[in-house]
Amino acid sequence: MNTTLNQIREKSPCTDGWEKLLKSLNKTEADDEPLSLITVLDSNGLDDAVWCLESVKGQDRQIILYSVWCARQVQHLMMDKRSLDALDVAERYANGLANKKELAAAMDAARAAGWDAARDDKSSAAWFATWAAESSATSVVTGFAAMSAARAATDLAGKSVWPEAKVAAMYAQEVKFREMFCGAMKS
């Protein structure tokens, strides 16, 4: 899957990430040459590669499915059915089985579940998991939601008593990213 430097630049990337990418490509300015997401991933890491999904055109289905996959990694912590429903609706939408109105309703419900979890303060883990679900549902509205879902899942793993859980979550997200957007595993 490809983007271009001009498409990335249109989305106002952070200065550090932008300069790092240009340097890795031995370039000083944006152009319209196809740029593989695997190149971005290998140069800048997962956060920037996921962020660059915002610049990819015509791949909403894959972006939504990646967001849902990330959120499903922490779905066992989702205490509110509205969050689980949002994942199901986002997945159905990506597969052409739900419409935008259904998706918007699911997104609103997941957002309300997140506020309820935050208000009840029963579990920060539940709040992060709910945030991941709501982010997945908003992928249609903004491709940036893929990063939100991935970040929520990673942050949630980071709350674990085992630091290795965060590393494992990031690794799993990178493997899935390579599979879905790059068609390959890093050897």
Could you describe each region identified by the protein language model?
Residues 1-187:
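Short, glycine-biased loop/turn motifs at secondary-structure junctions and
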